[in-house]
């Protein structure tokens, strides 16, 4: 990584999205330089990563005369194995969309924008940020983003500015399940989809989801005889394809999982050796679920008690190659009041199956150390003195670390507490659409003195910049 980045380079890199890119120019690495130099009839193959979602499948861009003419999957990519979903195959539409923003735009009236140069945009944004920082302190700036490869640079930039307020998408998507598994296991595991023999999906719709490689593996597992059970209020594509669909009442997954735990413990179907050697709190869990019978759960979930008991026994019979999915959204994404506890119940259930680290169970990925931006050569950012605007990680929200609680941002902007938030930079994120209560989000955006939207389209949020 370069030790010195200009503001212009940083913000232009922030714009990179779509299948191959989405800033105003192609990334300047060797493959693209060769593509630019190629003759009109020569087609070059340039490996890259798909940016149409966060999974980042491997792609090969076919380039003729400096223009991408086709996108294929990269067969050497270890996860996607040369396959692309419909969104990935459509990546060129983002790259060459006639409505794609190719240069900065400045508001000149209600709903009116005019082009402005990069230098002028940086100069005006920098001057306004400097003025607001002098009036209200560096914490007056919030940077709202999506978890992407550029996040370390965003964090580094905010530290240099002096603001602790880097926030974003996670809390409106998957933070609750991440917190649930991290507080139970210490980390968020995945599922060994290719070898699972019994798979329970609490609301996860694999066939219409974004994990290309996971779909390939679960299809292979079913071909080998795995039993797939979909727990979902909706007859999704996955539910229709699974061996069994359980049409649960929305938001009642916790009751269902607690009843499964009750049956497995009451009938001593759990992995006793694993529980004795590698868990703590079993007796407390046993006492806690004593009254959570299948009959109790049936009245809440609309799933027959006999079905709940059968599913519990089938899961236990297939252990350790049985798994309750750790999901993405599903029954314990950031959608329900009890989502964290639902995720914790799923974690406890998997532990009772003794499937942690087992073939066909849950898997933990090794941590790869790639270095940190604060270890780069050059000036070190000063220690940030201000508290976060949302109190994430503190007494009120001790588990809400990382990117914090973006859904609370409109209230903070409108109330001015705990301090005034006057500037917001939004990158790879559309809070008007993603956050609850869009009207309140819009009201908050209109109260700001500076809103900068880094996007390739005139998104719902960019329209208020």
Feature map (PLM): residue ranges:
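Flexible, glycine/charged-enriched surface loops at secondary-structure junctions
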Residues: 136-140, 270-275, 321-325, 357-364
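Short, solvent-exposed helix-loop connector elements
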Residues: 325-337
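A glycine-rich phosphate-binding loop feature that marks nucleotide/adenosyl-phosphate handling sites
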Residues: 146-147, 277-279, 328-329, 362-373
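N-terminal export/assembly segments and adjacent metallocofactor-ligating motifs
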Residues: 1-267, 304, 425-427
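Extended redox/cofactor-interaction regions of prokaryotic respiratory oxidoreductases
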Residues: 153-219, 224-231, 238, 254-258, ...
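Alpha-helix capping and helix-loop boundary segments enriched in small/acidic/polar residues
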Residues: 116, 184-190, 205, 209, ...
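Core structural elements
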Residues: 312-321
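N-terminal leader/propeptide and maturation segments of large enzyme subunits in energy/redox metabolism
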Residues: 105-118, 269-305
């Amino acid at each position: 990584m370069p030790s010195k980045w200009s503001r212009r380079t940083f913000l232009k890199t922030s714009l990179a999205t779509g299948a191959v890119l989405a800033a105003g120019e192609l990334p300047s690495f060797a493959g693209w330089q060769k593509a630019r130099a190629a003759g009109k009839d020569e087609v070059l193959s340039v490996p890259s990563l798909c940016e149409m979602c966060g999974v980042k499948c491997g792609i090969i861009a076919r380039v003729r005369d400096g223009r991408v003419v086709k996108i294929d999957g990269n067969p050497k990519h270890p996860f996607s194995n040369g396959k692309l979903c419909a969104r990935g195959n459509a990546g060129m539409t983002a790259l060459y969309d006639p409505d794609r923003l190719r240069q900065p735009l400045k508001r000149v009236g209600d709903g009116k924008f005019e082009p402005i140069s990069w230098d002028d945009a940086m100069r005006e944004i920098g001057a306004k940020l400097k003025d607001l920082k002098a009036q209200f302190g560096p914490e007056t700036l919030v940077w709202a983003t999506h978890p992407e490869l550029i996040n370390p640079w965003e964090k580094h930039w905010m530290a240099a500015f002096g603001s602790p307020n880097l926030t974003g998408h996670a809390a409106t998507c998957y933070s609750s399940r991440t917190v649930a598994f991290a507080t139970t296991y210490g980390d968020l595991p995945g599922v060994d989809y290719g070898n699972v023999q019994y798979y329970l999906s609490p609301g996860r719709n694999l066939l219409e989801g974004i994990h290309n490689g996971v779909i390939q593996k679960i299809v292979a597992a079913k071909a080998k005889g795995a039993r797939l059970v979909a727990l979902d209020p909706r007859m999704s594509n996955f539910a229709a394809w699974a061996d069994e669909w359980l049409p649960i009442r929305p938001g009642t997954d916790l009751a269902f999982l607690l009843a499964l735990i009750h049956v497995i413990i009451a009938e001593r179907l759990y992995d006793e050796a694993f529980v004795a050697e590698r868990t703590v709190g079993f007796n407390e869990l046993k006492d806690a679920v004593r009254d959570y019978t299948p009959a109790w759960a049936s009245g809440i979930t609309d799933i027959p008690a006999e079905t709940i008991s059968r599913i519990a026994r089938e899961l236990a019979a297939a252990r350790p190659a049985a798994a309750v999915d750790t999901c993405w959204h599903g029954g314990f994404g950031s959608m329900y009041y009890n989502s964290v506890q639902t995720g914790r119940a799923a974690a406890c259930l998997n532990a009772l199956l003794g499937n942690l680290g087992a073939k066909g169970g849950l898997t933990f990925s090794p941590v790869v150390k790639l270095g940190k931006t604060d270890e780069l050569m050059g000036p070190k950012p000063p220690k940030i003195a201000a508290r976060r605007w949302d109190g994430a990680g503190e007494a009120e929200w001790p588990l809400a670390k990382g990117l914090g609680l973006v859904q609370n941002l409109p209230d903070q902007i409108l109330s001015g507490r705990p301090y005034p938030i006057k500037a917001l930079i939004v990158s790879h994120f559309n809070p008007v659409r993603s956050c609850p209560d869009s009207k309140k989000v819009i009201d908050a955006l209109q109260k700001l003195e500076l809103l900068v939207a880094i996007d390739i389209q005139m998104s719902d949020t960019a329209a208020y910049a």
